[in-house]
Amino acid sequence: MRVKDFTPKLVPTSPGVYLMKDDSGEVLYIGKAKNLRNRITTYFQKQGDSRERIPFLMKKTTTIETILVSNETEALLLENNLIKKHHPKYNVLLKDDKTFFCLAISLTHPWPKIDAIRTKAITSSKRQIIFGPYVSAEACRTLLEVISQWFPLRTCSNREFASRRRPCILYEMKRCLAPCVHLCTHEEYEETLEKAVLFLKGKVSEIIQDLEKSIEKASQEQKFEQAGIYYRTLKLIQQAMEKQHVEKFHFQNIDAIGLYRKYQETVITVLTVRSGKLLGARHFPFSENAQEDTDLLSSFILQYYANQPQTPKEILTPIPLNIPELPYLLNKDTPPQLRSPKTGYGKELLTLAKNNAKVHAETTTQSSSLPYEEMKKILKSPDYPYRIECYDNAHLQGSHGVGVYIVYENDAFSPKSYRTFSISSLAHNDLATFHEVLSRRFSSLTSSLPDMIVIDGGRAQYSQAKKTLKELNLTGIQVVSLAKEASNHSSSLRNEKLFCDTFPQGIQLAPTSKLLQFFQKLRDEAHRFAISKHRRKRYKDLLFPQEKIPGIGEVKRKRLLQKFKSWKQVMKASQGELEAIPGLTKKDIQQLLAKQVEDSKLTED
């Protein structure tokens, strides 16, 4: 169904999934609905949908395709599968991370130790016991450090263990039982290892009871040094429990999901509680998302837990999802409980998750994102510029010229979209260079058109860019040119003039302007990229001069340049100097000497 032909009667009232596509057939957005007619109709009502991205989405949508299903559960599953297939721009899509941070105990060694690992499959076996997954490598390292303080197990490699003849410093620090030199029995070591396993399983109360019994037993047997080790371990665990308020969560496995939106930014944060301990947070920012909160969260949960080897007993969400089938889609054997508590410690966790999401959104927005509100005010830009290209060029006295553009897309630099153009004859003239680069960039539209282009220069460069786009019959692309103030060219906080469609004569922005700083960041990245490509071209031309000499390939050229520093000096080298270069044959030397004679004759002529 084409958007321009839309009438509500054309859409069925059944549950299903709808795909919104642009004029090229690319899927922009995928949604689900209990009643397709009611849902799709809201997109065509002025007050029907208050989400900020909907006007941008509808401007680009030319057709809407529907797929009917039997019920809401089928719609949810189909939506998730189609999102994974099409990767639509306005939906949430997570990267498929198939490795996890875990702790493992290898059972193949007579004196096992605990290691941090990354693995795809989290299943214990006869060869090893695996605990996790944990939110990060740092969480694993922190847990290992705690274990080494509480449970004096070995941490050395198997090779070091086999070669050790006396105990290391960890034994002196009471952080290892020194099984390498048999200063403990197998029974003592296994007892300590069992306590560490209980700790990793979250059975802290059992550890405390065992330690109290061990202290009493060791004291009765007058093993006072061993009793002291047990006592210190007991105190460390009790202190840690007091500091971390472990008892709050009753040793549960819980994930709390926080959601925060601001302008074009959406951040979802997952707080992970395992065995009553808050292990950390993972943040998932989405720059372009047009889903409602319930659709966003259900889609996120399906994708997130599809990549997790285990689901927690409880998943706390900021709003009720009211999808009874969702827990069974996550784990049909032991479905988690999905709830949205309004009081108690569950509410505290949700508040903490939302605050984390808010901080992450605001810090990333301040540091890197586009200041859209200021842009709307100054540039009078009604539409959000999803793709911005910034152009620059570099040359050395007219030689080795390159023109480049970098891409800022979806609120981040996109290095894979950067492009370079070799400029041979026009590098002396910035205006001609910009004209050539823009013409070549837009002559074959193999990549997406930008919403805005930014160039380094003043009014002349701005006018040249506008003229070139007009010649190419390209409309709807904003042009911004940024010029440094001549008298303050080297100042760190410099005044700059901005030339744009609303201010073709230029407007001066304060150095503290977020918009100015954003454009400066784009220009600096384009300049860095241009300089790097220019230097690479100079080096390549130096390494591979236009005159090819038979037998002198890349390896031999590098050896010659390492010795003589430049090709000009190579052409002045004596036969003896050339013979000292490893790898050069007599024929190679004859070719080089002949080339020297040829060049000298050309110089004389």
Curated annotation (Swiss-Prot):
Keyword DNA repair belongs to the record: yes
Protein species of origin: Chlamydia caviae (strain ATCC VR-813 / DSM 19441 / 03DC25 / GPIC)
Annotated InterPro entries: GIY-YIG_endonuc, GIY-YIG_endonuc_sf, GIY-YIG_UvrC_Cho, RuvA_2-like, UVR_dom, UVR_dom_sf, UvrABC_protein_C, UvrC
Keyword annotations from UniProtKB, A to Z: Cytoplasm, DNA damage, DNA excision, DNA repair, Excision nuclease, SOS response
Span of domain UVR: 205-240
Pfam families: GIY-YIG, HHH_5, UvrC_RNaseH, UvrC_RNaseH_dom
Lineage: Bacteria, Pseudomonadati, Chlamydiota, Chlamydiia, Chlamydiales
Protein name: UvrABC system protein C
Localization annotation: Cytoplasm
Subunit structure and binding partners: Interacts with UvrB in an incision complex.
